[in-house]
UniProtKB/Swiss-Prot annotation:
Organism classification: Eukaryota, Fungi, Dikarya, Ascomycota, Saccharomycotina
UniProt-listed Pfam families: LSM
UniProt protein name: LSM complex subunit LSM3
Family: Belongs to the snRNP Sm proteins family.
Encoding gene (name): LSM3
Regions annotated as coiled coil: none
Amino acid sequence: METPLDLLKLNLDERVYIKLRGARTLVGTLQAFDSHCNIVLSDAVETIYQLNNEELSESERRCEMVFIRGDTVTLISTPSEDDDGAVEI
């Protein structure tokens, strides 16, 4: 392994967990990526966290295919075995 992107190559066609700026996360199957860390996921679940009046709420949506701009990505990992898209923050 020579670069961090080599880790992504190992996870092509595998489920990945991606944390984005703006209190958003995605779990989906990694289909493609480039050197700017732009990512394409299929069968993705996006979770958006919002803090309203000191109460944390989350909304979820499913996407058949989604493109993620690389400059919004803060973390990429494999999801835990019981991960259904929801994570604790």
